[in-house]
Amino acid sequence: MHSINKIKDTSTPKRRRLGTGRIFRLSLSKTAQKSDLLTDCSPISSKSVDIGADATERCDSPLLPCNQVEFRSICDSDNNNSSFDVPCSPDVLQSSVKSEWESLNVCTSKINEICEINNEITNNQAQTEVLEDISEDMFQSKLEQSDINHVDKSFKDKIEQSFDIVNQSISNLDEVMKNKSSMFETRDSFLLDIKEDAIEKFVHPNQVVQESKKKETAVVNANNTFYGLPLIAKGLFKTYRNIEKFYEWQEECLNLESVRERRNLIYALPTSGGKTLVAEVLMLREVLNRKKNALFILPFVAIVQEKIWALSTFAVQLEFLVEEYAAGKGHIPPKKRRRKNSIYIATIEKGLALVRSLIELDRLHEIGLIVVDELHLIGEKGRGGTLETLLSTVIFTNQDIQIVGMSATIGNLHEIAQFLRADVFQRQFRPVELTEYVKLGTMLHRVVWGAHAQGVELVPHRELKYDYSAAATALDPDLLGGLVSEVVPKGSCLVFCSTKRNCENVASLLCKLQRREMISHKKAERQALESALRAEGANAELVQAVRYGIAYHHAGLASDERSLLEQAYRSGAISVLCCTSTLAAGVNLPAQRVIIRAPLVGRDFITLGAYRQMVGRAGRAGVCETGESIVICGSREWPQLQAVLRGGIAAARSVLRPGAGALLLSAVALKLATTRPKLRTLLDCTLLAVTGDDTPSDIKSICDDSLRSLLQSGVLEVVNKRQSGDDASHLSEKDCYIYNDSELTVSSLGKAAIKGCMDLSVAKQLLLDLERASRSLVLMGSLHLLYLVTPHDAAGVRPDYSHYYSLYCSLDEEGVQTAKILGITEHNAIRMMTGKPIKNVPEIVLCRFYLALMLQDLWNQMPFPAVAYKYSLARGTVQSVMSSSASLASCAARFCAELPRLWSFCALLTELAGRLQHCAAPELQHLMELPNVKKARAMQLLRAGYKRVEDLAKASADELTSGVSHLSRNAANQLISAARMTLIEKVENLRAEAEDVMEELNV
C-alpha cells in the first residue's frame, strides 16, 4: 500500500466517545441480550485492527460507502506528493481490501441487524432523542478546512490548465502543425476536444504551468524595454507594422507626466501623424502591465473591423483578447474574464451600451482606459450627443478610468480639455511632407501658411500644359485627366467628389483620357477584380472602369464591392479612386496625390475640418515618399475658399441639449443619480456646461425641463409624492412636486429603453408594434418579424408606389396575411398605383412594409443586385437597411428581455438578429464572422477548401496565398491571426462560463 500523508485527527475526541458510549449502553438496558451484537456494529467501538498504529491512532470514523473507498484509492495514486487524503477508520481500511460486492454484503447485514434493534426502541421517545444526538455527533465529523480548500484549488487549477493548454495550442498552431498535431481535426466544438483530452497528446500540464510562469516573468522583466511593453512587442511592430523606432513626438507623448500619472489626455496632430500608434501602445500597457481592460471608441463599423484585423496578431502573441462591438456583434454585458484582459473595439453606440451594462453590474472598474478616436465628432449632430453621454457618464462615476482623446481637427481644443479634465499635447508633425496647391484656371498655385498677415497666401507654382486634343479639351476643361496622369500608374491618386453621381461621372471621364500604359498595368490583377465584381453583380460601368485601373467608391456600393475595391487599391491594381468625403474620415486609404474636384461637400461649401481630413490622405509614411493635394477652384469660388482657409477650424459645440433627458434617465436607471441635485451635478460634467452659453441657472432649467418631460411621458416616477414646499419644483400638471431629496425611479419601459440603447420615441413605437403583433403575429415565415425591426424612419426610403401594386399581387399567403394585419389591402395598393392618397394607413407603415418585403428577399438569399433592381434602390442602400435592421433586432431583443410580458419576442428577435447580420448561405456564415471578411472573400476561402474558422486557424500564410487569388502575404497573416483570435475568444468564453459555475459553487 502506498504511504499515507499524515493529517490532523478530525474524528470525535476519545473522552467524548466514551461518554456517549456509556449513555448509549445505559439507554439500551432493556435490550442487554443483544448488546454484543450491537457492540460489534457500533460505529464508536474501540475495537481496532492492526494495520498500522499511525492510521489507527488518528482515525476512528464511521464506515464509508464503497464509492468513497474507491475515491480513497484514487487519492492514493502514484502521485506521492498529494497533500490531501480522506481519513478512514480501520474498518474502512480493512474493508477496502475486499471486493466491492463483499463490502456491500457486510454493510447490508450489519445495517439489517441495527434496524432490528431500532424497531424495538421506537416507542421510547427519550431513547430516540439520545440516538439522534449520538448520530448527529458521529456523522458531522468533517475534514479540516485547509484540506477542503486544497481539493477545491486543485480542481480549479486543473480546469484552468486545460483552458491554458487550448489557448497556447491555438497561439502556437504553426509549431503544432509542424508536429502534425490533431488538435484541429474536424470536430464540432472545443468542449469535445477538451473532454477527449486530445490536447494532452502534445502538451503536458506541468510543462504548461512552468511555461506560463516563465512568460509572466518575462513580461515583468521586459517592461520598459520597448516603450513600456514586453520585448516581444518590438518584434511584432517590426514584423507587422515595419516599425522599429517611434517618432520623437510619440516618444515625448508616451513619456508625458500626465501619461505616467494616468491623467486624462488629449493629443492633436495632423492626419497621418501617427496618432493611432500612441493609442495602441497605451492600450497594450493597460492590458499587459496594469491587467485592466481598455475600450477603443471608433466612429465607423469599417474602421472597427480594420482595427480588429490589425490588433489580432498582437493579441494572439501577447495573450490578450480583442473583442468587436459593432453592428450586431459583441456581448452585452461583456463576458467577465478572470485570466485575460480585453481590448474592446467599439462604435460610439455600442461603446455606450457596453459602459452602461458594466455600471449596472458594478463592473466598470474592470476598464482602466478609454481611447476616443476622432474626438471632434462630439460636436456632430446625433452621434455627438451619444459620445458626450458616454464620456460624461464615465467622468461622473469617478472610477479612476483614464480617458485619452485624439483628433486632427478640433477648433476649441482647450474647451474640450476642460470638459474631459484633461491635459493637452499638440504638435504640427507630418512624417511625409505635404505640399498643398490650388488650381485657378490653368495656373497651379502653392499654398503658403503663415506667410501672410491673414494666415494663408497663394504663390504661383507652374502653368499646366498637356497634349490635349481639341476634343479632349472640350471634354475635360479642368485638366483633371492630366493631373491624374502625372502620378499614375506608378503612384496612387484619390479624387474627392461632391456627390455619388459625380464620382461615377468623373471615373467615366478619366477612363476616356488615360494612356495605353495605364491599361497594361497589372492587367492580370485587374481581370481577376473584374470577375469578382461581376460575381457581385456590380454595374457594367464600374467593371469597365476597373480595366483602366480606375474605380469609384461611395455609399451606394455594396460593402462587398467596396471591400474588393479597397483591397485592389492597396495592392496597386486600382490606381485612381473617385470617392466622396466620407472616405476621408473612414477607411485608411492613403495616396501620393489627392485632388479635390470642387470645394463642395454635397451642396454645402467645404469646411476647413473637411479640407484637412481630405488632404491628410496625401502622403503616408511607408506608403508614399511625398504627398500633394490640389483643390480645383473656379474664380468665383476662390474668395469663399480663401475665407475658409483663413477662418480656422470650427469649434466642436455640445449637441446634447435634445438628448439631455436620455442622459438623466439612464443615470436614474443605473442608480448613479436619483435626486434632482445629483442630476444637476451630472449635467455639470457635460460639454454642454462648458461650450454652451448656458449659465448655471440654464443648466438647472435644462435639468428641470428634462425631468418634467420624462415625468409626463411616464418613464420616470417619484418614489414618494408630496405636496408643494419651499424647495420643490412643480413638474407636471397633476400637482406632482419633486423636492431636492425626492427619490426618482424609472418605469419598466424606461429600463427597457436603456437596456436597448434606444431613444424613447423609438422604444415607444417598438412597444406599440410588439403589443399589436402579440395579438396577431404571423409566424408562417419571417416577414412579420422583419417588419418589426425595419427602421422606424424607413431609412429615408420612399417606395416606388407605381411598383407597389405588382409587389402586392405577387405576395404569397404569408405576405397577404401580414399586410392584412398591418391594414394594407389590395384597395390601398390600387390607390397607390393610380397616385391617389391613402388615409386609412399611415405612410410610414407602407414604407416599412416595402422595406420588410425587401429584407425578406435578402433573407431568402436573393442576390443583392437583384434585390436592388427589384426595389429600385442602390445596393448600398439595401445593405444599409439590412445592417440597420440587424442592429435594431439586437437592441429590440434586449428591450424585450427587460419586459416579462414580451419574453417570447426576445427569443425570436435574438435569432433574427444573428441571421439578418449577413443573410448569407449557411456555409458562409462562420467565415463572415471574421473581421473584414465579406461574401466575396468568404466564397474565395470556401472554394480554396477553408470551410471553417478552424481551417483558417491552422493554415499557413504560404498555403493561403497560393490557394486564394490576389491575397497578399501580410493580409494572409492577419487573416490567420484573426481566425485564431476568434477561436481563442470562444475558448475564453467557455472558461468564463466555467469560472462562473465554480464561483457559484464557492470553489
Report the location of each language-model feature:
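Conserved interdomain linker/interface between the two RecA-like ATPase lobes of SF2 helicase motors
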Residues: M406, G411-Q418, D423-E504, A551
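Helicase-associated low-complexity/disordered flanking segments
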Residues: H2-L256, E261-I266, M518-G537, L542-V543, ...
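Conserved P-loop/Walker A NTP-binding site and adjacent catalytic elements of P-loop NTPases
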Residues: E244-T397, I401-T409, L413, A417-L420, ...
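A short beta-strand element within the Helicase C-terminal
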Residues: V576, L583-P599, E628-V631
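Conserved C-terminal RecA-like helicase domain
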Residues: L295-F296, Q305-I308, T313-A326, F496-V576, ...
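Conserved segment of the helicase C-terminal RecA-like domain
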Residues: L600-G602, T607-A643
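C-terminal helical accessory/scaffold domains
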Residues: S666, T695, I699, C703-S713, ...
